[in-house]
Amino acid sequence: MKLPKEGDFITIQSYKHDGSLHRTWRDTMVLKTTENAIIGVNDHTLVTESDGRRWVTREPAIVYFHKKYWFNIIAMIRDNGTSYYCNVASPYYLDEEALKYIDYDLDVKIFTDGEKRLLDVEEYERHKRKMNYSDDLDYILKEHVKILVDWINNGRGPFSEAYVNIWYKRYVELKNR
């Protein structure tokens, strides 16, 4: 699969462990691709839920996906600062159709004031039983929550204000071409 280039638009598809489609984002603009990572932006992007409901993202958001980490990061740029929504998820896979990953329910939300919350623990436990997550998978996911929290606490990558500013500026430049 040929990597998308800066300024290209891609579709993102989130699946559940049982293979069912969970959510789709249309027209995410690619800002950078490397061998292991894709950085993009959603801005008034159409999102379709598995039940057919549709909505549009409200604010620009820098999205970060990696082939080695079991999480992805959404930095939502708001008037009062940046908030984050982090999905504990499989490393991404890219094919001709979309960037794809498996969503494993656990989420970390960081508010503009820095407060952090681990979300959907009950949903994770329920799906772990229902979809038979292996002990190895459970271990990997929990270890990557620790890695994610370390990134947050140390302002690494997308959790750096400079990172968000650089990629938002690049998005504005590409959008206004």
Curated annotation (Swiss-Prot):
Its EC number is 3.6.1.15, 3.6.1.6. It catalyses: a ribonucleoside 5'-triphosphate + H2O = a ribonucleoside 5'-diphosphate + phosphate + H(+); a ribonucleoside 5'-diphosphate + H2O = a ribonucleoside 5'-phosphate + phosphate + H(+). Mg(2+) 2 binds at D105, D107, D120, E123. Keywords: Hydrolase, Magnesium, Metal-binding. It comes from the Bacteria. The keyword Iron does not apply. SUPFAM superfamilies: FomD-like. Its cofactor is Mg(2+). Mg(2+) 1 binds at N87, D103, D107. One of its GO terms (molecular function) is nucleoside diphosphate phosphatase activity. The active site is at R23. Belongs to the Ntdp family. Has nucleoside phosphatase activity towards nucleoside triphosphates and nucleoside diphosphates. This is Nucleoside triphosphate/diphosphate phosphatase. It comes from Streptococcus pneumoniae (strain ATCC 700669 / Spain 23F-1).
